[in-house]
Amino acid sequence: NSDRALKTSITRDATNPLGYFDRELTKRKRDNKEVFDFVDPSREGADEFNRWPDGLRDFRDAMTSLFDGLSMLTERTLGVIHGALGLGKDSREQVAFSRLSSSMRLNHYPVGDPVPENERTGLVGLGETALGYHTDPGVITLLLQDDVGGLQTESRDHGWIDVPPQPGTI
């Protein structure tokens, strides 16, 4: 399959954690997802780490543009949070957003196992969910939510509650 060949050509490995991957584990179970990770394409040395598919320059350009736009949104969002917490200007400069420490991940949650059957020998079985519950790492996650749902937020009084998908929102 040509899609599989394209994905395996940019698969991450022990020397580079960026690129395509379909075998992540959460609590010793394989996640039912495929991911593509990259860092700021404009960052010095990024070409040594980012793995882009050959012949898909439009994909790389689109991801660069998306990274730029979401980086600006992240900075603005963190500024709003900072202001809402009543922190002073000096404090804001100490926690300033840095694109150098940012990465982007594209997640795909397929209906079935993302690993072809002929490649599953010796792999840990799939977990019960697409990925571990409430496992986003980092300071902030910007989610371009689809119409499937699955996003939750924690309420002090009611525990985890579903956030209904809203078209066009992040």
Listing of model-derived features with the role each one plays in the protein:
Residues 1-170:
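Peripheral, non-catalytic segments flanking oxidoreductase cores
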